[in-house]
Amino acid sequence: MRVKELHPLCCITLESPHGINSQSPEEPVTTALTRSRSLPAKSLTGGSESETVAGILYKWTNFGKGWRSRWFLLRNGILSYSKIRRPENLNLLSPDDDVRLIGDISGERLSRMDSCSGRRKQQKTVGIVHLKVSSFRESKSDDRKFYIFTATKTLHLRTDSITDRAAWLQALASTKCIFPLRSLNGDFSFIPPKDLSISTERLKKRLHEEGMNENLVKECEQIMLSEFSEMHGQVKLLHEERTNLLDALRQLEAANLEVGASGKHEFSSLGRGKYSECSTTASSDGKQEFEDVSEEDEPSFHDTKEFFNEPNIGSESNLAISGHTDIKRRTKLPDPAEKEKGVSLWSMIKDNVGKDLTRVCLPVYFNEPISSLQKCFEDLEYSYLLDRAYEHGKSGNGLLRALNVAAFAVSGYASTEGRHCKPFNPLLGETYEADFPEKGIRFFSEKVSHHPTVIACHCEGKGWKFWGDTNLRSKFWGRSIQVEPVGVLTLEFDDGEVFQWSKVTSTIYNIILGKLYCDHHGVMQIRGNRQYSCTLKFKEQSILERNPHQVNGFVEDVAGQKAATIFGKWDDSLYYVAGDGINKSKVSDPASNASLLWKRTKPPPNVTRYNLTSFAITLNELTPGLQEILPPTDSRLRPDQRHLENGEYEKANLEKQRLERRQRMSRQLQESGWRPRWFERQGESDTFKYTGGYWEARGHRNWDDCPDIFGEFTEELADAA
C-alpha cells in the first residue's frame, strides 16, 4: 500500500513504493521521522556500539604516586575512568548493561547500580575521553603499555598482561570504526530521488478544468517536477549540514566535560597560551601527564588526526626539574632606578686615543640587559615550528618537516630588527639555563672558550634536540662592522632525521653617522640526511631597496627536484608554495596560492630603547624560587647585567669594569689547561657537545665544582686551575 500525503501548495502527492523510512501505511510521515530519530545505535552500526567494555587499567599520575589503578568504562564512543575508592566493589551502570570485562576481575568485586531505586551510589567519573577526536597507540618499549592522545592530555596506561593490552586496543579500534558510518547515516534518512515519484493527477485535472490544452499541462508538470527535484536536493544538503553541526556539538560537549573533569584546560593553541606545569607531588588525574614516549621507535598511529601543540612529553628529568607551578612571566622590564645619561661615541674615542684598546671598557650604555648566552636561547623563541616539524615527520610528511625547519632557521633573525645595543660578553665558564615548560623546551649554554670566544648550547624539545657552538669573526669597514658566525647548528629528531646549517653574515651599518641598522645576507644551506634539503638566500639590503629583508629559497629532494619554494622576510613572515612555480606577484601578495609557515609575534606595548621582544624580556628574569637553585655561574646572577636591568647605571659601570678586568685575567685559566664544565670538544674537530649532568646536578643543587666567576679574581684561583 502506498503512502500519500497532500502537498500544501500544489496538490502534489508524494509516492514511494515502500513508504518513507519503512513506516506502516497508517502512520503519518511526521510520526515516522520522529521514530527514526529514536532508533537504537545498533540499527546504524550493526551492533558494534551497543557493546560496553570495562576493566582495571593502571594510569600514570605523577612521579610522587606513580602508577595508580583506575576503573575504565568504554561505552558509546566515550572512555571514562574513575578512582577505585572501595577495592571490593566496582560499579557498573545498570543490571541491563551487556558489559565485556577485560582482565582478571572476580564476580564478587562487581556490583551493579539499581536503575529503579538508585540505592547504590555510582562511582564519580574523574576523566572522559571522546574517541572520535582522539588517537591511540601501543608502546614499543613495554608490551603492557599504550597511550591515548587527546587535545587536552595524554593518558599513559598499562595492563596486567599482553593479552589485556591487545583486547583494549581492539575495543578502542572497534569503537572508532563506528564514527564514519554513524556520521553518514545521520539521525534520519531521505529517500533517494530515483525512488521518489510525484503524483500530479489532481494538478492536471485542475488545469484541464481551467481549459488549458494538453501541451501546456505537460509543460506545467515538467516545471513542477524540476522545481521539486531542486528543492529536494537543497533540503538534503541542509540535512547534511545539520548532521555535521550536531556531531560537532557532541564533540564540543564531550570536550567541555573532559576539561571540567580535569579541573583546568592545560592545552595552548600554537604554543602561545597559558600553561600549568604539573607538580611533582600533587595528584595528576586532573592534570597533564608527562613521560618519555619519544625514546621509542617510530610510532604506528591508529588515527592520524593529531594536534601539533600537545604539551611537552619530555624525559623524566624534565618533569623532575620543574619545581614551580603556574609560572607567570613578566611583560616588561623593571622601572629604572635612575635617569640614564647619554654617551657620545666621539668623546669616548677621543678620550681613549693612544690607549690599549684591549683595556678600554665600553660603558653599559652600549649594552642591552641580556648576555650572549641568553641571546642564543632567543633564537628558539619560535620553537613551536620544530614541534610541528616533529609531528609532520611522524605522520610521514617529510616535506612539511623540512619547510618548518627552514622557517625555524629564519625566525631566529626576527628579534634583531631594531636592536641597536650589544649583549654582554660572557665570562669564561659563564652559563645560562632556561626551563620553559610552557614551550615544552629546556635550554643550556656555556662559554667554552675565551680566545677565540666560543659559546656552546644544547636544547631539548618534544621529539627533538638542538645543539651547536658559534664563534663570531668580525671585520671593521669604517662605517660598518661585518660579523660572520663560524659554527654548525644541528637539529636531530627522535626518529633519526638530522638537519644541519650555519648562520649567514650579519652587518651593522652607520656605526659612526646616520641611522644604525642591522642586515643579514648570504646563502644558508640546510642539509638533511634523508629525503629533503633546503637552500635559503638572504638578500642584502641596498640603498634604494623598497622591500628589504627578503628571503627566498627552495626545498629539494635527493634527486635535485624542487619540491617547494619559500619566500618572505626574515623580520616579518615566511610563506611557501608547492613545486617550482613562483613569481614576483606572489611575493608582493602573500595571500595568493602561498601558505603561511611562520609569522613574527607583535612587539610588546611597553617598548624601551633596547627594543626587546616579549620573549627576550623574560630571559633575565628571576622567577620565584629560581635563584636558590641556580649555579653561581648563571648569567642571571651577573651583577653588572642585573644593575643595568634595574636602571642602576653607575653601579652597572663599576661592576662591568671590575668583571672585564677579571675577564682579561681569565686567559691565564685557559692557558693553564682550563676545560668547560658541561661541554667537551668532539675528537679533532672544533665543535663542542653537551656531556650531560647539568639538570641532574640542578636537581640535587650540587654546584661544588662550579667556581664563583662573578667574584674577585685571585692568584690562588689561577694557580688552582
Curated annotation (Swiss-Prot):
Domain PH: 50-177
Protein keywords: Coiled coil, Lipid transport, Lipid-binding, Transport
Alphabetized PROSITE patterns for the sequence: PH_DOMAIN
This protein's record includes keyword Cell inner membrane: no
Keyword Coiled coil assigned: yes
Pfam families: Oxysterol_BP, PH_11
Function (record text): May be involved in the transport of sterols.
Protein name: Oxysterol-binding protein-related protein 2A
